[in-house]
Design a protein with these regions (language model features):
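Thiamine diphosphate
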Residues: 2-176
Length: 176
């Protein structure tokens, strides 16, 4: 697959803007779990030679990969769905939080108004309470202009050495 450097220009789509924010904040490792809403970002990550992309099969596995990248001196990020947040609780608490590892988590926030898959709705009710219970800061992107906050959120995540959830809902992706 063709690898390219940082993209530029006014016509840049939201996925490219997200990846450029990753590069600007020196994120060099991204692991992803397949998600239809996040497919554009995953494709954009794959195109950049500044980012080592490792797809994974399970979000808890992705937490371990990110921990390894961080311990190896590379800033990590995981891209995942909120419906799998529950399976990452142990990895987040016992590994990422216990060892004070910064980890931005770009999470598709499935299950809100406009969701077409009924089974996604239940986890949407639990996503924010789980993050609050774990003391993980979360930011909810509803509209395309919310992307303007991403660089500051990433910078804060690495400064504070804590995981952070960036929840991007269907309205964010449809507005992009």
């Amino acid at each position: 697959m063709l690898k390219i450097g940082k993209l530029a220009g006014a016509e840049m789509d939201i996925s490219e803007r997200i990846v450029n924010n990753f590069i600007d904040n020196e994120i060099g490792f991204v692991t992803t779990v397949p998600c239809k809403q996040l497919s554009g970002v995953i494709e954009a990550v794959e195109k950049h030679d500044q980012i080592h992309h490792v797809p994974c099969n399970h979000e808890a596995e992705g937490m371990g990969l990110c921990a390894g990248a961080f311990l190896g001196g590379t800033r990590p990020c995981i891209i995942m769905q909120n419906t799998a947040l529950g399976v990452t609780i142990n990895s987040l608490a016992a590994l990422i939080q216990y060892y004070q590892m910064p980890l931005p988590m770009l999470i598709s926030y499935r299950g809100e108004v406009g969701e077409k898959v009924a089974c996604q709705v239940e986890m949407a009710l639990h996503t924010i309470p789980i993050l609050q219970q774990m003391n993980i800061p979360s930011y909810h992107f509803h509209k395309a202009s919310d992307i303007e906050e991403l660089s500051a959120i990433l910078n804060h995540t690495f400064m504070a050495s804590k995981p952070t959830a960036i929840l991007a809902d269907a309205s964010f992706w449809s507005a992009a």
